Amino acid sequence: PVRSITRTFASGKTEKVIFQALKELGLPSGKNDEIEPAAFTYEKFYELTQKICPRTDIEDLFKKINGDKTDYLTVDQLVSFLNEHQRDPRLNEILFPFYDAKRAMQIIEMYEPDEDLKKQGLISSDGFCRYLMSDENAPVFLDRLELYQEMDHPLAHYFISSSHNTYLTGRQFGGKSSVEMYRQVLLAGCRCVELDCWDGKGEDQEPIITHGKAMCTDILFKDVIQAIKETAFVTSEYPVILSFENHCSKYQQYKMSKYCEDLFGDLLLKQALESHPLEPGRPLPSPNDLKRKILIKKQTTETEVEKKQLEALKSMMEAGESAAPVNMLEDDNEEEIESAEQEEEAHPEYKYGNELSADDLGHKEAIANSVKKASDDLEHENSKKGLVTVEDEQAWMASYKYVGATTNIHPYLSTMINYAQPVKFQGFHVAEERNIHYNMSSFNESVGLGYLKTHAIEFVNYNKRQMSRIYPKGGRVDSSNYMPQIFWNSGCQMVSLNYQTPDLAMQLNQGKFEYNGSCGYLLKPDFMRRPDRTFDPFSETPVDGVIAATCSVQVISGQFLSDKKIGTYVEVDMYGLPTDTIRKEFRTRMVMNNGLNPVYNEESFVFRKVILPDLAVLRIAVYDDNNKLIGQRILPLDGLQAGYRHISLRNEGNKPLSLPTIFCNIVLKTYVPDGFGDIVDALSDPKKFLSITEKRADQMRAMGIETSDIADVPSDTSKNDKKGKANTAKANVTPQSSSELRPTTTAALGAGLEAKKGIELIPQVRIEDLKQMKAYLKHLKKQQKELSSLKKKHAKEHSTMQKLHCTQVDKIVAQYDKEKLTHEKILEKAMKKKGGSNCLEMKKETEIKIQTLTSDHKSKVKEIVAQHTKEWSDMINTHSAEEQEIRDLLLSQQCELLRKLLISAHEQQTQQLKLSHDRESKEMRAHQAKISMENSKAISQDKSIKNKAERERRVRELNSSNTKKFLEERKRLAMKQSKEMDQLKKVQLEHLEFVEKQNEQAKEMQQMVKLEAEMDRRPATVV
């Protein structure tokens, strides 16, 4: 009917506009007319949409591409547009090749309606619009909507679409239970459903499913099992997990087991696979291994008695005794008594009616009794809204206490539990030590958040090995949902949500699991599966091996957003890691009174740094002027396509809306930190970034200079480097001559220090400088004084001995002269008295006496000379020994003093280097603080940042980046300073060894001088 078309396309326009458009298309246009379906072709439908909602935004884009010069695009222009705008630059060029003329011609052939333009290889604005609105230009890679992931990894390596309290259609209190919910949830791709099982109280005592003690209606367990059988593998062939919350007696547990066995048949996985035995350390089977299999998640037997029963049951079953389970029930009197004691009532208000007061049943039962008269009345009231008053409901909620599942398990039910065995969580370290992959634990959202807060990395590692299930906390009586993203970030497999509530959390869940063929299983990223990788879900820095992304979304326009003349605006949010999540920050302006084709033309909303694109999702939501949701779409970032895209919207329940779309320009690229853009551009396109020399060579060629005419010359830098190396070479070291008292060298002691880079600023230590020091000069002066004093003493002793010897010689000579003169005078007197002739005999005698006297004199002189020579030589030797001894002592003192002075100089050098390092570190910290302040100031003054949250995020990101960079700089500086200190100590050690070696050489030379003096020693005297 035309009336239906009018309602669909009106969008605030008058009916006359629609009628006129239909008339122009040659279709019936009367209000009561009807259009033949065969006449209303897709082409007519497309033309009708274009007449009602003209695409001026695409016209503007078309003119921008061709420069508004023609009414068409050439192949080259189309190829350029496709490669520059419609292609993600991060994609591999081999797997995702660039568009070429051939591909552009295929697009023209497919979407250009004008045959003449097709033949010319041109595309009109109409053909361009058809292409942009086609499935080929979908906002996501279409293959991601098919089954594209590997399904051979262990179950723990997948996110699993999971439901909580699947049977409820609404609230947790006074809600209605429905078998149909299981069908719808499974058809939607959910792979884990929950069954709260209670004892039925009818004559047949059939197990029921209900929300115990919450005044919810009941459904039969067997009906649910039948519904699961019918729909479990319609949407997906991968395994379904039934999460049993068991409150039943053992008898009804047995009935549950038989229903599962009889209705599911071979679909039920009753035994572990031979390839994956239930042993510690053995990984779980893969979804492919468990295709078309149903697993039961339930605690196994707890007590020793139950374990013995289970072993006996298995033995009987292997022997083919089918009646064993029933017989076991009959014999199990003790367990029946215990079961009766622990039995819980699903509806205590049914049993007691109005007989019990609040004291008997508690406040919640009393309120229930005041509202309900019998079970029939209760069920009737449950089917309507407003089950109880607000006050009654609040009282129920305040007094409600969750009743845990029984641990008294029938052995027959235990035989059906294998790869999903819940255990009480005792800690991550305990789970790691046990290493049992088929054990799993459930956490309510609050407990899960607590573990994430304190043990985030351990939680991620736990989820690499075994499964975990998160479910809403008990306070969510309105069946609202928590945000699942935080638990996906930590690798939790079963993030269970209330499917009956189409809130934001469910939209994220359904948008995420729409990928991979809606099979209900999504493979976790590599770093969340590999045991050798560590991942912190709260990290604010890029993950090793994962390339961060930048995503910008420009909301251009909307089409057919509402059938009313209302105002609309668009919000764009990002969900992912905490640092990637940006909500309620980016929204367009409100376009008033236009629900048909509002044009927003906003500046791009830029998500600068998405650390983990694999976990991030983009949410685009349209609201009216009353902030009511019109439509939304969840787009996982890892499958998002760049370019100008039409995004078809979904309702709050994620059901596709027929016409509403948002036209956006999406830009995806690799995240590049500020300041590194030029480097990345140079790496991605080196030809555009030639070196300076290459540019100069090109300029020379442009002037007619041939490349062969340009000689290769060495750079000044290399010459300077060689010169510097030559200057820093160590000079030859030569010892002093032996005639000097102390050793020295012609080269500076610090020559070796110059060769060490990084410590050039420290003054050199030279021997000459040490010898010019006041302490050394003072000590040298003292030594010279001691030596001079000794020499004076020796000179005095020389003089004394010389005088003594001279006196002794003079005395002997005088005595000789006297005796000789006496003999001569006696002879002379005799000759005078007797005459010369008479004294001949006497003369001979006198001559003989004189000869004898002379002979004696010579003998005495010889003796005295020998004695003097010995005394003089002994004295000289003694003096020489004393002088040599004191010279040795003085040399030793001098060497030791030089050594001490050098050590002292080294200590000063070390202290000076430490001060230099402290000053350098202080300057670096000051410089870093200055940079941080300047960067923060630049962000605060950046007018391109539109809101406070983005500014704070940029500051936080900057602080994180600066902290990492500054710590790295300080680490490098500390390493450099440590290296310089080591170099200095090494050089100082070399210098000390050099000085000690010189001292030893000086001592050896001194010994050689002493030895030469001893060897040259001869008898001597002074005459």
From Swiss-Prot:
Q: Domain (C2): give its ranges.
A: 532-657
Residue positions where Phosphothreonine is found in the record? 734
Residue numbers spanned by region Disordered: 711-742, 930-958
Tell me the active site. 164, 211
One of its Pfam families is C2
User: Locate the PI-PLC Y-box domain: which residues?
Assistant: 413-529
Domain (PI-PLC X-box): give its ranges.
Answer: 149-299
Q: Which GO terms describe its cellular component?
A: plasma membrane
The organs and tissues expressing this protein are described as: Preferentially expressed in the retina.
- Please provide, alphabetically and separated by semicolons, the GO molecular function terms listed in this UniProt record: calcium ion binding; phosphatidylinositol-4,5-bisphosphate phospholipase C activity
Quote the PANTHER family the UniProt record gives.
1-PHOSPHATIDYLINOSITOL 4,5-BISPHOSPHATE PHOSPHODIESTERASE BETA-4 (PTHR10336:SF36), PHOSPHOINOSITIDE-SPECIFIC PHOSPHOLIPASE C FAMILY PROTEIN (PTHR10336)
**What's the protein called, per UniProt?**
1-phosphatidylinositol 4,5-bisphosphate phosphodiesterase beta-4
Q: Which organism is it from?
A: Bos taurus (Bovine)
